Amino acid sequence: MTHDIHAQRILILDFGSQYTQLIARRVREIGVFSEIRAWDMSDDEIRAYKPSGIILAGGPESTTEEEAPRAPEAVFALGVPVLGICYGMQTMAMQMGGWVESSAIREFGYAQIKAHGQSSLLQDIKDHVDQDGSALLDVWMSHGDKVTKMPEGFELMASTPSCPIAGMYNEAKKFYGVQFHPEVTHTLQGKRLFEHFVLQLCACEKLWTPANIVEDAIKKVREQVGTDKVLLGLSGGVDSSVVAALLHRAIGDQLTCVFVDNGLLRKNEGDQVMDMFAKNMGVRVIRADAEQLFLGKLAGVSDPEKKRKIIGGTFIDVFDTEATKLQEVKWLAQGTIYPDVIESAAAKTGKAHVIKSHHNVGGLPEDMAFKLVEPLRELFKDEVRAIGLELGLPYDMVYRHPFPGPGLGVRILGEVKKEYADILREADAIFLEELRAADWYHKTSQAFAVFLPVKSVGVVGDGRRYEWVISLRAVETVDFMTARWAHLPYELLEKVSNRIINEISGVSRVCYDVSSKPPATIEWE
């Protein structure tokens, strides 16, 4: 049975909050499609969009300023439920006749709100019970302004000692405002609040599921490319692997993948990619063995940025060479995902609704004259992983740690040589193997070895040896914007160190990186 998984959708208007993408993810986790657009979307665009409900997100501006962003008038005239969060609640109050003032006490961090009234939004939601029987909720606050007068027709929904109007509602119109952030995990009942809004008040069905997303994507790809041939650069990373599996299911032999083996991959990675896609799934994969070409161009180059540019440019040259050998290819497939779309639009214009028509990831030549097919461009990373599993990809492939585009080229400090790459490949493989054996691989967000181009003295038997240093790096993070070094057990680190020094010729010392981000970045270069 075919479902229109976009028919019921929640429109999220972004006023610049760092949490806006979290709102979209929370709605989708419930099983309903949501999309982020800029706050200045026109009234006609909103009416044409036909949302099932609208969420006004937070933002850094002050609604007390005359030039502050305002929600389009159509938001309140459309007749659909509206949820205002933080700044969204404040602009709702101002635009409907209420009042907002700067608060003498800024609230940032944990707070406890007291529920009031009989709103459908907070019905039966509580973390604790007050002495008078009122529901108390543990929430996350982040605001400097506060609503001091509710618009006519609104009732009090929540309060804190320093913010007497921390929530308001108009049940007849299904308008709700909360000063706190239900999208962050610190607000313990945030998911239930979104479920009440999306499933009950907006009356949406749970159609946004991995199986339905796959079905919808296959249908769209077939409509888009018809009987044309499609080319995909397969890296072995999560996004390109999921695109390969999805396109193969959609169009079969019309897909050709090019896998560029640059000599800077992890141990056995090239063989694993070929086994998975060419051997097991029957995907047509061309493997371009370009190790000597890449290492030749990198000889004598130590600057990290120059190394990146050489690796990126050489990849394009190899890919272009393979592409010109193929006949009648009209489409280029890419693993663009939704955060790429949002971020590139925001970077170009400051507005999330100007979606790029050509997301030229990796800087592929403009004169290649391919049309673009991007089957993941609506999806967040966690959704990409979910549909990867739905398509039958192995869990370890779908949930593998991130690997930089330049590969080991930026994990070898300074000049890249084959000797260094071979040593690093073995050290990295030992580290990851032991992490998996100790059940630590999926507890860390990213783990890898780094080759340091310095020699250190070591003692083996009766002899001294002067050899290379390997540093191990493992971090825990939610968003990769900040990260904490992983507190791995000493016994595990000792085992990894002993194996690397004993099993790899040319290594005399192993260190563990205990730097967090910031100030250090996750990768060394």
From Swiss-Prot:
GO terms for cellular component: cytosol. Residues 208-400 form the GMPS ATP-PPase domain. It catalyses: XMP + L-glutamine + ATP + H2O = GMP + L-glutamate + AMP + diphosphate + 2 H(+). Pathway: Purine metabolism; GMP biosynthesis; GMP from XMP (L-Gln route): step 1/1. SUPFAM superfamilies: Adenine nucleotide alpha hydrolases-like, Class I glutamine amidotransferase-like, GMP synthetase C-terminal dimerisation domain. GO terms for molecular function: ATP binding; GMP synthase activity. It comes from the Bacteria. Keywords: ATP-binding, Glutamine amidotransferase, GMP biosynthesis, Ligase, Nucleotide-binding, Purine biosynthesis. Its EC number is 6.3.5.2. PROSITE patterns: GATASE_TYPE_1, GMPS_ATP_PPASE. The active site is at residues 86, 181, 183. Residues 9-207 form the Glutamine amidotransferase type-1 domain. Pfam families: GATase, GMP_synt_C, NAD_synthase. ATP binds at residues 235-241. Homodimer. Catalyzes the synthesis of GMP from XMP. HAMAP family: GMP_synthase. This is GMP synthase [glutamine-hydrolyzing].
